[in-house]
């Protein structure tokens, strides 16, 4: 079987970009069990409540739901277990220094396969205020309206 090439997105945390200003992004590997990889290859994952924390100078991802593999037996994993993220030591220290500042957090943005290996894109982010969210929605609506007007003008 030939190796996969390219990026196959499994899950995206759309809520993260709505609730946070993402400042920096990093690509990290994930330490997974075999049944988790099989479940991800089927496209099953939810990142809605995901977040990352430091334990013993290691970065862990929590709140990600990867359902049990259908054909798995007693070797199946628990769906919401904590998963270790694999990053270089320099990246870990850089991230830990950033989140020590008040108001910063680490959120998982996207879960994907890159050349056959499971990866997660994490972002160092700061929470948005309610008025920021409303302003973002207003800007998106204005862009949509402008595109609609341009389409109508080009048609006619």
From Swiss-Prot:
Gene Ontology MF annotations: RNA binding
Highest taxon, organism lineage: Bacteria
UniProt-recorded name of the protein: SsrA-binding protein
Function as written in the Swiss-Prot or TrEMBL entry: Required for rescue of stalled ribosomes mediated by trans-translation. Binds to transfer-messenger RNA (tmRNA), required for stable association of tmRNA with ribosomes. tmRNA and SmpB together mimic tRNA shape, replacing the anticodon stem-loop with SmpB. tmRNA is encoded by the ssrA gene; the 2 termini fold to resemble tRNA(Ala) and it encodes a 'tag peptide', a short internal open reading frame. During trans-translation Ala-aminoacylated tmRNA acts like a tRNA, entering the A-site of stalled ribosomes, displacing the stalled mRNA.
Similarity annotation: Belongs to the SmpB family.
GO biological process: trans-translation
Subcellular location field: Cytoplasm
Source organism of this protein record: Arthrobacter sp. (strain FB24)
Gene name of this polypeptide: smpB
Transport in keyword set: no
Keywords per UniProt: Cytoplasm, RNA-binding
Record region (Disordered): 131-156
InterPro entries: SmpB (IPR023620), SsrA-bd_prot (IPR000037), SsrA-bd_prot_CS (IPR020081)
